[in-house]
Curated annotation (Swiss-Prot):
The gene is algX. It is found in: Periplasm. This is Alginate biosynthesis protein AlgX. Residues 1-30 form the signal peptide. Belongs to the AlgX family. Coiled coil: none annotated.
Length: 485
């Protein structure tokens, strides 16, 4: 093939490169929207606007389509809380299998904590009409089937179905699994989940090799929760709901002074928790796990991280690369799509630390200016087919959270890719990802990489980039195809 002159890239670039950007998943940003201030009395029914899906216009609002009024201050979302389908696409199953096998090759066992929905757990809070419409048996059956699919791929999967159809006596204090007007579980929900997860972890062969430690949990105060569902109702209807107050808990090593850690072996936990904001400190899920499992846990989850935020940040860290855990607990909810290619391309690249310590097929170091910047050009016509290669781009400024790039190929095709890290994450300025291999992309030969520079007037950005041979992980031989049936 005749090599395309680099200047030809500029001609091709005249087409709208911003179209078709492969946006990375944005998790539900639970704590971003502040509670609006209203003077209305607490309400007991939603306005008509809340029942019309067309009024949920922004990406964030669409996570709440559409709100349903339940008993008292309880609200539910029809698409997420009252879903009856739990599934992904064939490509999603294929990628989940590859991810499991890659972790297994690194000596890491993955435990999947697949949360039951609010509808499955708290359906008895629905009003009679909505409860009759919600096919609980179908939802529970499909949820349990999905747990089985994860297990068939080789994941360790605690069965959380006993937590469903909760019926707490009214005379007891409010220890509900979920908040009335928020998608997060309460600390009591986190605790009940942790007990089941811990029982499963203790059955794993790896558990026997992990140093044990006793923990105890104490009530540490109260938190006021202005729920995300309540906030959305306020935006759509101008109504307000009462703040829900809930016990908070902290977990500490049993009988140890505050400086006891200096002399313990807890500096290198062999269990790590990655996950969503459900694993944040407000709900003490990590603490309850430590108490129930009886071992130190490194919690790297953060609010607003979504499905992949904390996982990607952790895989690129020294903690994972230098001392990978024996057990990795991955907590996420069914609302996240499991077939997002850009996420897997990053995780698979970072599992073996991208291009770190590998021979670079191409490399460059430059300062980005506003607009498009030609970063790498395959001027010697090397064999850089997608199936065998990955990209590792590092900004000198660790606070850079967005990479917008165009990958050009020898036959004139191109891919626009956009990777956005959560604003809440403590980032490292690094973006590593495999070249695209879905559909018919595996045989494409890379010509050039263009990267979008800073906004006009902003400081220039220093960046380094490498192309190297991608990681090859042995397949685990699980029955992926059967899982997707």
């Amino acid at each position: 093939m005749t090599l395309m002159h680099p200047h030809m890239i500029k001609l091709l670039s005249l087409s709208g490169l911003t179209l078709g950007l492969l946006a990375a998943s944005q998790g539900v940003r639970a704590d971003e929207i502040k509670a609006p201030t209203f003077t209305a009395e607490p309400c007991c029914s939603l306005c008509p606007a809340a029942h019309d899906a067309k009024n949920y216009t922004t990406r964030y609002q669409q996570n709440f389509t559409t709100l349903v009024q339940a008993q008292g201050d309880w609200l539910f979302r029809t698409q997420e809380d009252l879903r009856t389908e739990f599934d992904t696409t064939p490509s999603g199953y294929k990628r989940m299998q590859q991810l499991h096998d890659a972790f297994k090759a690194k000596g890491v066992e993955l435990v999947v904590v697949y949360q039951p929905t609010r509808g499955l757990v708290n359906r008895n809070k629905l009003n009679p009409e909505e409860k009759a419409k919600f096919d609980f048996d179908k939802a529970l059956g499909n949820y349990k089937t999905m747990l089985g699919r994860f297990a068939k791929m080789g994941y360790v999967v605690p069965d959380l179905s006993p937590l469903t159809n909760e019926q707490l006596p009214d005379e007891l204090p409010a220890h509900d699994f979920y908040f009335r007007g928020d998608q997060h579980w309460t600390p009591y929900g986190a605790q009940r989940t942790a007990k089941i997860v811990a029982a499963k972890v203790k059955q794993m062969p790896e558990y026997a090799e992990i140093p044990k430690r006793e923990f105890e949990t104490k009530r540490s105060g109260r938190m006021g929760k202005t729920g995300t569902l309540h906030n959305m109702a306020g935006q759509l209807c101008g109504t307000s709901y009462a703040i829900q107050y809930m016990d908070q808990f902290t977990t500490e090593p049993k009988g140890e002074a505050g400086d006891g850690d200096l002399f313990s072996d807890s500096g290198n936990p062999q269990i790590t928790l990655v996950g969503t904001s459900h694993s944040g400190k407000n709900y003490n899920f990590a603490g309850f796990l430590e108490e129930e499992i009886g071992a130190d846990i490194l919690n790297v989850a953060f609010p607003g991280g979504g499905l992949e935020g904390s996982m990607i940040q952790y895989l690129g860290s020294d903690e994972f690369q230098k001392s990978p855990p024996k057990i990795l607990i991955w907590e996420f909810s069914p609302l996240y799509r499991l077939d997002q290619e850009t996420i897997y391309r990053q995780m698979m690249a970072l599992l073996d630390n991208g291009c770190e310590g590998k021979t670079a097929q191409m490399s460059a170091s430059t300062t980005l200016k506003p607009g498009k910047n030609e970063l790498l050009v395959n001027s010697s016509n090397k064999d850089l087919r997608n199936a065998n290669h990955q990209v590792d781009i590092r900004f000198a400024d660790p606070s850079v959270k967005t990479l917008q790039a165009t990958l050009w190929y020898m036959n004139g095709r191109h891919e626009d890719i956009k990777i956005e890290k959560p604003e809440t994450s403590d980032t490292d300025g690094r973006f590593a990802f495999e070249l695209r291999t879905d559909e018919d992309w595996a045989s494409q030969n890379l010509l050039a990489v263009e990267v979008q520079g800073p906004e006009a007037g902003a400081a220039a950005q220093k960046v380094e980039a490498k192309i190297c041979t991608r990681n090859v992980f042995p397949a685990g031989g699980q029955q992926t195809a059967a899982a997707g049936q």
